[in-house]
Amino acid sequence: AASDVYKRQEYYYAAHELLKYYRNRADINNPNINLINPTITAFDQNIADQALEHRFYVRNFKEKEENGKEVYYSFDKDKKIDWTYVPTEITDQEFKSQTHRHQWMLPQAKAYRVNQNEKYIQSWIEVYSDWLNTFPCPEGTVSKDAVQWYGLQPAERVLDQIDIMPHFIQSTNFTPQWLSTFLVAFAGEVECIRNNYYTDGSNIYVTQVQAITTAGILMPEFKNAEAWLSEGSQKITEQITAQFLEDGVQNELDPSYHIGVVAGFYNIYK
């Protein structure tokens, strides 16, 4: 077992055993993914392909349309990824926030599972490694200025990463070293959310709690997974009533938030 090898301080072999475990794990069922008969929409395939060239999908933003397909903004600058990039014509703060939700990564994972082309996982590893090196996980309270680690950003990343990992896990490019990097980063993301809950009872808070609870359910191997599940379950139970007014409308009085909150509860129930 991986834990036995780890105790002997044979860390590479422990990671190797852990990778073997995750590749063969059969007792955890993620209802959000279908690995037996994987499919991908043309929309997601376009996102996956453009991300290979560092044209990253940022929800609700596109540079233009070409041949019936959306073309996304390029984050390339001097042969590197410019994570601070904001197009001059965009003043909406949402672009910056959405960038750090990595919304192109799950489409790349789906593309890999459907097409079995290693370029998708190679792109994911390259880009996510670059992002992790650029934005180390902070400890404690995060300020609003650290948009990469604030609010919805880590919560949406955690939810996606739980789905991304099984799509890529069988690839030869998913090495023991990369598994270690990924899992350490994942645990850091979850703990960052726990240290920075929104306290206003908003839809953001529900997504944070959804991420913690889902991590506890679908990644039970982590030493803190029991705490994630316990904490998340308690908060979700509280929010099922706290989120809604007496007439059943979500407390922020926005139909899109109402739908989002209900969807969050339903996904946990699944």
Regions found by a protein language model. Give the residues of each.
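Short, solvent-exposed helix-helix connector turns and helix-capping sites enriched
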Residues: 7-11, 54, 117
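Short, functional "switch" segments adjacent to catalytic/cofactor/reactive centers
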Residues: 25-87
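Aromatic-lined, polymer-binding surfaces characteristic
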Residues: 79-80, 85-270
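Helix-centric, low-specificity signal for extended rod-like, repetitive segments
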Residues: 16-18, 48, 94, 150
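Short, small-residue-biased leader/transition segments that mark boundaries at the very start
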Residues: 2-6
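Generic alpha-helix initiation/capping and coil-helix boundary signal
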Residues: 8, 41-44, 208-209, 225
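Membrane-proximal, glycine/serine-rich, low-complexity loop/turn segments characteristic
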Residues: 10, 18-21, 28
